[in-house]
């Protein structure tokens, strides 16, 4: 989706989420040359009651922690992997993923001009999930926030995710 984005400040990050406490992680691009501010690549938020089941199916009790790693597998195509694979979130308090398309060219369909077709493509952007690298991608219910240049989705569990149309 993007060829001219600045590099990411970090392509991977790890933190501990504790059931009963809110947790979040942000990944950022590096600032462009001559600029002080950078732009956000993604936000990941876990509510205090989001953690539900470990990958082995066992319940996560209040106060238990889970080590979470987010790795950008392909920054040009906005592909991200979340570990531990198989972690499940509560349906009443799902985790929230926001992926930003701030660094994506305004000519999103790459036809050489910025026009209404690009706006239509932006409205069709969605977060997609892939259970394993060899399996197909499936669309996740998502909301485009065009003015903020981002797509939001609630996550039921961990796997690979990408922003696409």
Show the residue positions of the predicted features.
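Beta-strand secondary-structure signal
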Residues: 43, 96-98, 152
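Proline-anchored loop/turn motifs at beta-strand termini and strand-loop-strand connectors
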Residues: 28-61, 100-102
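Eukaryotic short linear interaction motifs
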Residues: 106, 135-136, 161
